[in-house]
């Protein structure tokens, strides 16, 4: 008879994870043709903050612009800097525009970039690419 309501059960499951923010971390930038996603993690890979162009309010073709990447990177870097991160390694993946502007914005936010690695997956002649657009 002493049964918890479903709302109380959901609150128990939705506990906020406690992530340790270290002075040195990682920034993962995923730049596709349609969007850009930026994740700031600690050295073990736990996400401290994340942002995307879509989350920042950009829609459609405006999501893959360098300005959208700049706004998303600013949001992410600000949360990480306030948490105590001062240095980072940057991992860039994907062919999209806005990769350089995101890195520049992270540096301007006060986080020193130690290394920049391009981890874009390259096929050894795998899947057939999409056909060329005809406008």
Swiss-Prot record:
Q: Write the record's keywords in alphabetical order, separated by commas.
A: Ribonucleoprotein, Ribosomal protein, RNA-binding, rRNA-binding
A GO CC term? ribonucleoprotein complex
Name of one Pfam family that matches: Ribosomal_S11
Spell out the subunit comment: Part of the 30S ribosomal subunit. Interacts with proteins S7 and S18. Binds to IF-3.
Q: Identify the InterPro entries for this entry.
A: Ribosomal_uS11, Ribosomal_uS11_bac-type, Ribosomal_uS11_CS, Ribosomal_uS11_sf
Give the protein name, as stated in the record: Small ribosomal subunit protein uS11
Ribonucleoprotein: is it a keyword of this entry? Answer: yes
Q: Family per UniProt?
A: Belongs to the universal ribosomal protein uS11 family.
Q: Does the keyword Protein biosynthesis apply?
A: no
| Position of the signal peptide | none
* Example of a GO biological process term: translation
Query: What function does the entry list?
Result: Located on the platform of the 30S subunit, it bridges several disparate RNA helices of the 16S rRNA. Forms part of the Shine-Dalgarno cleft in the 70S ribosome.
Q: Which molecular function GO terms apply here?
A: rRNA binding; structural constituent of ribosome
Native species: Cytophaga hutchinsonii (strain ATCC 33406 / DSM 1761 / CIP 103989 / NBRC 15051 / NCIMB 9469 / D465)
